[in-house]
Swiss-Prot record:
Residues 264-283, 421-478, 514-552 are annotated as: Disordered. Belongs to the herpesviridae capsid scaffolding protein family. The keyword Hydrolase applies. The gene is UL80. GO terms for cellular component: host cell cytoplasm; host cell nucleus. This is Capsid scaffolding protein. The keyword rRNA-binding does not apply. A motif (Nuclear localization signal 2) lies at residues 453-459.
């Protein structure tokens, strides 16, 4: 049977509060739970109850925290560890030559693989106060060997002798060690009694797992975040620095420092070889790959001093860069600047070459230069001519000007700063427009704002294509209106030749008579009071004229009824034109 292995360490540190509330255990609660604890607690691997490897020989609540002393007794587990340690190159090297430790592959393998202790206890402190000491409601369930504990300061130290293990922790007093020895002897007597009772039958190994389960646990340990920084912090917190041990945590300083895990993450990497023997590692880590979960602090670049920099003007800086370009082409230069591309050579034009006729006249003057010169600046861009829409333009010409075609040889630049294009037939159409008769102008009446000014007619666009059928229909409608107005104009001219002698007498114009309204509805209302006056008037009009006077409208021949005009003659030419316009509107209706 293999020799047992003892493991010791703190399960709870009172000077280091945990980051999670469920892991907090006060000293008073620990004392109360220890009194209710019955029997030794099992010791397993990674809280796997099937991988029980021994038992907890002693639990002592000291000033620094809850200390545990366990014993690994499983032959199967120790045999697996022994075979695995023989395959490890790091373990096979043994302790350093200057160390007084004896080579022990099992202790070194356990110190590197299961470097922490973890206590399984009840989460609810209040509910655990009234719990009994049975296995179902016990306050402490078991202690596990793990890669790194969730509580800080729970570093595991392995050894073959219990006193040697307890001496690694400076926080334990002599009274604490004596109490642990008493618990260890009591648990040993209980274990001996149990082994004597089972001497008739083969002793059952508590380790029910296998090597595959241990391999799975080791793979899970690789994904623990910041495992090595936590182990370094735990080692300094516990104080396992001045005494040699098999702990595979990183190098710790010789003096005790204030522990802060947040500052520990930002510490620079410590040198692998130190001049102090107590600070050196038990085994060099040069041949071992760094685990995936570990983080290596990047090396900080030296800060630039004030006298390392020189201020230069921008022109001087660029001149230095330009002077260093020829040196960059030499062998071994650190940087090579790209060569400046030569300017493009212009094509040589031949006067007899038909393929070069599409080039403009400036291309005939270009010749390739003998030396590389900077490229010529681009020619100035001539703004496109702009011309307002000319109603005399054809559709094709107007579209060309609106799209902004460049001026051609048929254009000339006038003095007022605008472009003009000579079009065939333009002068002829301009003469026809200037010599147009009154028939091409819209009719205006006296009294209007634009009377006496020529107004252009609406031009019918009969020359458009079939796509402008809607515009042609609109032009035809304007032609009908124009013809009706021309007919009214001719009739009004005829009335002016006949009526002025009888209607525009000086005595009638001098008589202050109110001008009647020009609406047809008002004339109908005034027909009754004018009936008696119409009877006394001379009977020079026909019966048709008298009936029209009674109705208050103009007759079909545009001749004003004498009885109505005798009573209400027009006072001036404006009134006459208004009456004639009303008569024209009535005729159109």
């Amino acid at each position: 049977m293999a020799d047992p292995v003892y493991v010791g360490g703190f399960l709870v540190r009172y000077d280091e509060p945990p980051g999670e509330a469920e892991l907090f255990l006060p000293s008073g609660v620990v004392d109360r739970w220890l009194r209710d604890c019955r029997g030794p607690l099992p010791l397993n691997v990674n809280h796997d109850e099937s991988a029980t490897v021994g038992y907890v020989a002693g639990l002592q609540n000291v000033r620094a925290g809850l200390f545990c002393l366990g014993r690994v007794t499983s032959p199967k587990f120790l045999d697996i560890v022994q075979k695995a340690s023989e395959k490890s190159e790091l373990v096979s090297r043994g302790p350093p030559s200057e160390s007084s430790l004896r080579p022990d592959g099992v202790l070194e393998f356990l110190s590197g693989s299961y470097s922490g202790l973890s206590l399984s206890s009840r989460r609810d402190i209040n509910a655990a106060d009234g719990a009994a000491g049975d296995a179902e409601t016990a306050c402490f369930k078991h202690v596990a060997l793990c890669s790194v504990g969730r509580r800080r300061g729970t570093l595991a130290v392995y050894g073959r002798q219990p006193d040697w293990v307890m001496e690694r922790f400076p926080d334990l007093t002599e009274a604490d060690r004596e109490a642990l020895r008493n618990q260890l002897s009591g648990s040993g007597e209980v274990a001996a009694k149990e082994s004597a009772e089972s001497s008739a039958a083969a002793a059952v190994d508590p380790f029910q797992s296998d090597s595959y389960g241990l391999l799975g646990n080791s793979v899970d340990a690789l994904y623990i975040q910041e495992r090595l920084p936590k182990l370094r912090y735990d080692k300094r917190l516990v104080g396992v620095t001045a005494r040699e041990s098999y702990v595979k945590a990183s190098v710790s300083p010789a003096e005790q420092e204030t522990c802060d895990i947040k500052v520990e993450k930002e510490r620079p990497k410590e040198p692998e070889q130190s001049h102090v023997p107590t600070e050196s590692m038990s085994h060099p880590m040069s041949a071992v790959a760094t685990p995936a979960a570990s983080t290596v602090a990047p090396s900080q670049a030296p800060l630039a001093l004030a006298h390392d920099g020189v201020y230069l003007p921008k022109d001087a800086f660029f001149s230095l860069i330009g002077a260093s370009r020829p040196l960059a082409e030499a062998a071994g230069a650190r940087a090579a600047y790209p060569a400046v591309p030569p300017p493009p050579a212009y094509p040589v034009m031949n006067y007899e070459d038909p393929s070069s006729r599409h080039f403009d006249y400036s291309a005939w003057l270009r010749r390739p230069a003998y030396d590389a010169v900077p490229p010529l600046p681009p020619p100035p861009v001539m703004p496109m001519p702009y011309r307002r829409r000319d109603p005399m333009m054809e559709e094709a010409e107007r579209a060309a000007w609106e799209r902004g075609y460049a001026p051609s040889a048929y254009d000339h630049y006038v003095n007022n700063g605008s472009w003009s294009r000579s079009r065939s037939g333009a002068l002829k159409r301009r003469r026809e427009r200037d010599a147009s008769s009154d028939e091409e102008e819209d009719m205006s009446f006296p009294g209007e704002a634009d009377h006496g000014k020529a107004r252009k007619r609406l031009k019918a666009h009969h020359g458009r294509d079939n796509n402008n059928s809607g515009s042609d229909a609109k032009g035809d409608r304007y032609d009908d209106i124009r013809e009706a107005l021309q007919e009214l104009k001719r009739e009004m001219l005829a009335v002016r030749q006949i009526a002025p002698a009888a209607l525009l007498a000086p005595a009638q114009l001098a008589t202050p008579v109110a001008s009647p309204t020009t609406t047809t509805s008002h004339q109908a209302e005034a027909s009754e009071p004018q009936a008696s006056t119409a009877a006394a008037a001379p009977s020079t009009a026909s019966s048709h004229g008298s009936k029209s006077a009674e109705r208050g409208v103009v007759n079909a021949s545009c001749r004003v009824a004498p009885p109505l005009e005798a009573v209400n003659p027009p006072k001036d030419m404006v009134d006459l034109n208004r009456r004639l316009f009303v008569a024209a509107l009535n005729k159109m209706e």
